[in-house]
Design a protein with these regions (language model features):
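Short, compositionally biased, intrinsically disordered N-terminal export/targeting signals
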Residues: 1-4, 144-146, 191, 227-230, ...
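Threonine/glycine-rich low-complexity segments that form extended coil/beta-edge repetitive scaffolds
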Residues: 1-10, 14
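Active-site beta-strand/loop architecture of penicillin-binding DD-peptidases
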Residues: 2-5, 203-206, 210
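Structural flexibility/helix-modulation signal
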Residues: 19-26, 32-205, 217, 239
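Proline-poor, low-complexity alpha-helical tail modules
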Residues: 155-159, 208-239
Length: 239
């Protein structure tokens, strides 16, 4: 910004972009997203608990505490295995992250900023949806690559903030729509709760522990959505 003093002398005032703050806000959003997508993939791809029925009191009394715990854990860990609702949410998230946005006449995608998932065969188990930022010193996979994101922030912060704001707003909005109350799923659940209750109502007492597990999942996912929203708000406040 150029201004003049009362003596008619020109003074130039420059404002530096807080590259680190914007970078951290974006990285925080990916940290929360990666945690969420990985946990969902783990739940969806969990091992089958076929043959493991909820234990009766008599069956529990004939087993050790350790045996009961392992048995029930096997059931709980598979509650969301191959769940249609969860799969739909996962696909929505992954499709949204592949979106591109036009800003000032130019199209941008995550790859424009050096952000991508690993190859199908090189990524770890349940990590095919996890994103890595080139040049991230804390990421052993991409730390040696050129830091395109930081360079983009330094040269054109408005475009960077605009892109990531649009991207994560889309993800957050679509997730909210997917998880809204419907005839088959209650709000903010990732399994067909109403359908399950109808099909297995006679086992209400036997699946109480399983229901507690589901509640834990719901709380976990909701907290991650909130964390993503908080990170998005911080990013929007940078400009």
């Amino acid at each position: 910004v150029t201004a003049k003093t009362k003596d008619d002398e020109q003074v130039t005032i420059t404002t530096d972009t807080d590259v680190d703050a914007i970078y951290k806000s974006i990285k925080d959003m990916f940290t929360e997203y990666n945690k969420l997508i990985k946990s969902m993939d783990e739940a969806y791809n969990a091992d089958s608990s076929k043959g493991y029925e909820p234990l009766t009191d008599d069956e529990k009394s004939a087993m050790t505490d350790d045996e009961v715990e392992k048995w029930e854990t096997k059931i709980k860990d598979s509650l969301l295995r191959k769940d249609d609702t969860l799969n739909s949410i996962i696909n929505t998230m992954k499709n949204d992250m592949a979106s591109s946005f036009t800003i000032n006449g130019k199209s941008y995608a995550l790859s424009s900023f050096g952000i991508a998932t690993q190859g199908y065969f090189s990524s770890g188990e349940n990590e095919k949806g996890v994103y890595h930022i080139d040049g991230d010193s804390e990421d052993s996979v991409t730390s040696g690559n050129d830091d395109k994101l930081r360079a983009a922030i330094a040269s054109d912060p408005e475009t960077v903030v605009s892109f990531f704001s649009q991207l994560f707003t889309k993800v957050y909005t679509d997730l909210g729509n997917k998880m809204a109350t419907s005839s088959i799923s209650s709000a903010y659940t990732v399994y067909n709760d109403k359908q399950m209750n109808k099909q297995y109502s006679e086992y209400t007492t036997k699946i109480s522990d399983a229901e507690n597990k589901i509640t834990t999942w719901e709380d976990y996912y909701y907290s991650k959505f909130s964390a993503m929203e908080s990170a998005l708000s911080k990013l929007n406040s940078q400009t």
